[in-house]
Amino acid sequence: MALLQIAEPGQSPKPHERRLAVGIDLGTTNSLVAAVRSGVAEPLPDARGRLILPSAVRYHADRAEVGEGARAAAAQDPLNTIISVKRLMGRGLEDVKQLGEQLPYRFRQGESHMPFIETVQGLKSPVEVSADILRELRQRAETTLGGELVGAVITVPAYFDDAQRQATKDAARLAGLNVLRLLNEPTAAAVAYGLDKGAEGLVAIYDLGGGTFDISILRLTRGVFEVLATGGDTALGGDDFDHAVAGWVIEQAGLSADLDPGRQRELLQIACAAKERLTDATSVSVSYGDWRGELSRAKLDELIEPFIARSLRSCRRAVRDSGIDLEEIRSVVMVGGSTRVPRVRSAVGELFGCEPLTDIDPDQVVAIGAAIQADALAGNKRGEELLLLDVIPLSLGLETMGGLMEKVIPRNTTIPVARAQEFTTYKDGQTAMMIHVLQGERELVKDCRSLARFELRGIPPMVAGAAKIRVTFQVDADGLLGVSARELSSGVEASIQVKPSYGLTDGEIARMLKDSFDYAGDDKAARALREQQVEAQRLLEAVQSALDADGERLLDEEEHLAIAAQMDSLRELAGGSDTAAIENQIKRLSQVTDAFAARRMDATVKAALSGRRLNEIEE
C-alpha cells in the first residue's frame, strides 16, 4: 500500500530544504523583489537583468502590461496607463478627487465609495492594479529562484492606516501571494543595514520615495527596535519634485498650464529625467516641443526647497515627539530613490549633524530588509534566530481608571518587540502613579491576569491631564517582559521585569481566548459604561475644583445654581448603568460650564500679562 506524504501548509516535506520566501517593496514609483540566496539578501532581476520594476500598468483590451513598457507608454496612452497607484490604495473617491490635478484618469465610484479607474479593459480598482504589479514580481521571483513561494513580506509606509494596509493585503491575495507580514518600511531599512545587531542607540530613518515621505525615530535596545515616534506625509515625494520642474518648464516656455493628459505625462517624464541627471551633473539641457533651456542644480535646489523643508519640519516634530535631542541620534538611514538628490542628502546631514548612511542603494534597501525578515519567518534561520518566530499568546497591557484594561501589545505580535504609549494623571497635584501590568483579552481588569505592580514616584505636581508618562513594554527574544514608566518633563523613571507566559498552560490560554470571544459583546458594553463613568467623575472633580477656586468671583448666583443642578444630575446618573444617559449629561454639564471656563481662561491670561511690556510679550 502506498503512503501519502503530508507536509504542514507552507512548509517543505523535506525538513532541510530551504523554503522560498521573498521581500517586496511595493513602491509608488518603483517596486522590487528580493530574497536571501547563499546567505546574502539581494534583489532579484528579470530576464533582461533589470532589478527595478516601474510601478506602472498599461491595460490593453486583452492583457495587462507591467513595468518599463507600460511607463514608456504613459505619455501616448495616459488614460489606460496607471502609475503611482499606491497613492490610491485604501482611499475613497473623495480622497482621490483631491489628487485630481495630478492624475489624468477617469474615475467611477464603486461599492463602499471605492474609486475605480476606467480603462479599455473595463473598470479597475487600485487593489487590482497593485495586484498586477505584485503578480509580475511573484512570477519573477519564482522563475529566478526555481520554485513556488511559501510567502512574502511586503513593506508599507509607517503612515499607512488600517484601510491602506488591508488594501495591500487584498492585492497580494489577488496576486496569489501569501503575506507572511506587512513590515513598516523604516524597520525594513534598519534591518537591511544590520542596525538590529549593532550597538544600542537611537536611529532615524528618512524615507523619501516617489509619493510618500516617512520619518521614524527608533531606539535599539538588546536587539529590539522601539519606535519612539513616526511622522511624515502621505502626499510628499519625488513626484512633487517632478511637478515643480514641470511647472518651471511651463513658465519658462510660456505655455498654458492646462495641458492634455498626454502632453502632461510627457512633460513629467522630461522633468524626471532632468532631475535624475542633476544627481551627477551641475547643469543639464531641457527641451520640450520647440523650447530649449538650461536647468542648473542650484535652480533645482531652489524649486524643491519647499518640499525638503516640509520633510525637515516632520523630522523635527518626530524628534520632539520622541522626547530626545537631535544630537542623541547616532545614525540616519536614507531610503527611497528621491534621497539620491544631492540637496536632500546635504539638508538631512545638516539637520542631524552626521553623514547619512547611503552604502546600500536607496531603491533597494527596503526590499533587502524585507527579504531578511521573510527568510526568518519562513523558518530558514537556525539556532537563536528562530526566536524571531515566537509570538505573544495573549495581549499585554495595564490598568487605567475605572478598572479598564488598556492593551499595549496585542496577542500574536512577533517577538522581540517594544511598544510605548503615553498616559497622564487623573487628579490635580498627583505625584505618584501605580502601574498594574496585565495579560488577557477581556476589557475589564477583573477578567484579566495580573502580572506585576510597581509605582512611579516623583511626578511633578500639575493639574490633572498635564503630566505625560510614557510607559514602554518590551519583550525580548526569550519572552521576558520589561515594563518601564518615565515622566517626560522630569525624567523620573521606574521599571520591572516579569515572565508573562510563566504558569500558563496551553489550555488556560485557549480558555482565556474563548472567553474573550464569548463575552465580547458584554465586555464592549461594560467598557463603554466604565469609560463614561470615569469621564463623569473626572468632569465633576474638575468643575468642583474650578468652583472652589473662582466660583464666587466669576459666577452670579443663577449661574452657580444652574451648574450645581447639572452636577447633581450627573452624580446620580453616574451611579447607574445607562451609558447613553451619562454621556448626554456629561455634554450638558460641559455646555453649562463653557462660559465659566472661558472667563477663567481670560482671567489667567490677563494675570500672566499684567505688568509686562509689549516687546517682552513679542519675544
Swiss-Prot record:
Keywords: ATP-binding, Chaperone, Nucleotide-binding. InterPro entries: ATPase_NBD (IPR043129), Heat_shock_70_CS (IPR018181), HscA_NBD (IPR042039), HSP70_C_sf (IPR029048), HSP70_peptide-bd_sf (IPR029047), Hsp_70_fam (IPR013126), ISC_FeS_clus_asmbl_HscA (IPR010236). It comes from the Bacteria. One of its GO terms (biological process) is iron-sulfur cluster assembly. The keyword Membrane does not apply. One of its GO terms (molecular function) is ATP hydrolysis activity. Pfam families: HSP70. CDD domains: ASKHA_NBD_HSP70_HscA. HAMAP family: HscA. Belongs to the heat shock protein 70 family. Chaperone involved in the maturation of iron-sulfur cluster-containing proteins. Has a low intrinsic ATPase activity which is markedly stimulated by HscB. PANTHER family: HEAT SHOCK PROTEIN 70KDA (PTHR19375). This is Chaperone protein HscA homolog. It comes from Pseudomonas paraeruginosa (strain DSM 24068 / PA7).
